[in-house]
UniProtKB/Swiss-Prot annotation:
This is Adenine phosphoribosyltransferase. Pathway: Purine metabolism; AMP biosynthesis via salvage pathway; AMP from adenine: step 1/1. Transmembrane segments: none annotated. One of its GO terms (cellular component) is cytosol. Its main location: cytoplasm. Catalyzes a salvage reaction resulting in the formation of AMP, that is energically less costly than de novo synthesis.
Length: 182
């Protein structure tokens, strides 16, 4: 975790009982409405990765696109989009996974990566790790390697970061929340 005097958590809105009862959803839209907050998040990731040895950035549909595209632009790296099933127009690789809400499928264009590529994968949040594990599996199926999985938020009680690390995927998050934290 990285921290300084900036209160990142204050820009992440808790939404109780969304999308279902008992869940506290972590809404990052206030972060994107704050130029200072967005700059802070981008700067933290850029500082971490500016000299890192990877070739591509992979961003998860949909909120991962927001920060992933900024970092790809700032680091001058190609951006690979990992989309929900049925959203990509060309030949795809598909990977099923479990989320905290049920089963889903993640897809990537089959020709977007190749052997020797190294991919930093981004999402807004790590909960169960299902989305990023599916992305890591897709990356590996292309012959590429996963450099690291990065997110703004970690929910460590849901074990996603632990699951990613157990699968050989290092993780980095800017902040974390307990499941009951408001």
């Amino acid at each position: 975790m990285h921290s300084d005097a900036f209160d990142l958590k204050a820009l992440i809105r808790p939404v109780v009982d969304f999308p279902k009862p008992g869940v506290i959803f972590r809404d990052i839209t206030p972060l994107f409405q704050s130029p200072r907050g967005l700059r802070y998040v981008a700067d933290q990731f850029i500082e971490r990765y500016v000299e890192a040895e990877f070739s591509h950035i992979g961003a998860m549909d949909a909120r991962g696109f927001l920060i992933g595209s900024i970092i790809a632009h700032q680091l001058n790296k190609p951006l690979i989009l990992f989309r929900k099933q049925g959203k990509l127009p060309a030949d795809v690789l598909s990977e099923g996974y479990q989320t905290e809400y049920g089963e889903a499928f993640l897809e990537v264009h089959a020709d977007s990566l190749c052997e020797g590529d190294s991919v930093l994968i981004f999402d807004d949040l790590i909960a169960t790790g299902g989305t990023l594990l599916a992305a890591a599996n897709l990356v590996r199926r292309t012959g590429a390697q996963v450099f690291e999985a990065a997110a703004i938020i970690d929910l460590p009680e849901l074990d996603g970061s632990r699951r990613l690390q157990a699968a050989g995927v290092p993780t980095f998050c800017l902040t974390e929340f307990s499941l009951s934290e408001y």
